[in-house]
Amino acid sequence: MNYMMTDNEVFKEGLAGVPAAKSRVSHVDGTDGILEYRGIRIEELAKSSSFIEVAYLLIWGKLPTQAEIEEFEYEIRTHRRIKYHIRDMMKCFPETGHPMDALQTSAAALGLFYARRALDDPKYIRAAVVRLLAKIPTMVAAFHMIREGNDPIQPNDKLDYASNFLYMLTEKEPDPFAAKVFDVCLTLHAEHTMNASTFSARVTASTLTDPYAVVASAVGTLAGPLHGGANEEVLNMLEEIGSVENVRPYVEKCLANKQRIMGFGHRVYKVKDPRAIILQDLAEQLFAKMGHDEYYEIAVELEKVVEEYVGQKGIYPNVDFYSGLVYRKLDIPADLFTPLFAIARVAGWLAHWKEQLSVNKIYRPTQIYIGDHNLSYVPMTERVVSVARNEDPNAII
């Protein structure tokens, strides 16, 4: 619903479609299905680049030279380890806690260990970028191991970024093709213009706080079910469907009841999500190499049936539809799917943090007040007693 404020101001719920920044970081054309990072098509980057090179491109605004990428990779490899204080803090977290909550807390805690310096200091910016890219995956893997009752697996400096994360979950070097698929998944999730978590990052950055608080803010936003977690819900849906034979009845039931089919449709893309096209091809290769399972067969049939019914309305699989299948095939627990999103999106958040600093003006929107006016203060003895709720008075809230 829109509410007119003045001749030049319009209120929109959720700021839907309202430009909140000018940016050079990424571009989406939802009509033609185009996603570009710094002007380069995602298809080219997925085919020819690596996640670390893509992170460099997003954050520094250009493709690195051989010397630049080697230095960047070396810096990240040598900063992967986290301080034992962080590990000890994680051991105090409840093992039933969600990994995103653990990640948000741990990311914020990094700011305690690295002195805040001037945000116009290139060395400070470089160090913060390296630390966050290097340590976020380690923190995700460490909390997972700790909640399982195990000691965290130390990073393997011989392995690349994607391979090292998979190694820290199992202490086994991953299959090279599986690691490559995971690396492409990180690239596909690294950035996607202005969304809730990126907006949160830019708002936080605009206050000139430290970059660890910026990333913690974005992680907290991504943790919400309306933003992250869709690929986990796709797996829950596939489990509910149960078999290929149940796909068509399930789709018909959802359409009849106007229920959402997880992993389909996008607020921006009116055609098939270009990231989903890339992931579909990679998933086919991965399952061909490592063996099909029933989830994959159900997903293939589901895509076919959904497109048959509603493809003409521009409802196609999005990136979440296949990413969950890929992560499951890589033996990654489902509740780590959103932390994986965060690992990748740190690159985009840092790019927007750096861009916000270059043109900074603190975000200060306004509101439309819709409450009461001119009410009188009522003394306690004259207030109407509300009906007591049936709650345990001794319960801890």
Curated annotation (Swiss-Prot):
Record: active site: 266, 320
EC number: 2.3.3.16
One GO cellular component, as annotated: cytoplasm
SUPFAM superfamilies, per database record: Citrate synthase
Superkingdom classification of source: Bacteria
Keyword set, alphabetical order: Transferase, Tricarboxylic acid cycle
Pathway connected to this protein: Carbohydrate metabolism; tricarboxylic acid cycle; isocitrate from oxaloacetate: step 1/2
UniProt catalytic activity: oxaloacetate + acetyl-CoA + H2O = citrate + CoA + H(+)
An individual GO BP term: carbohydrate metabolic process
Keyword Mitochondrion: no
Pfam families for this protein: Citrate_synt
GO MF term set: citrate (Si)-synthase activity
Note: Citrate synthase is found in nearly all cells capable of oxidative metabolism.
Similarity remark: Belongs to the citrate synthase family.
Protein name: Citrate synthase
Annotated organism of origin: Synechocystis sp. (strain ATCC 27184 / PCC 6803 / Kazusa)
GN (gene name): gltA
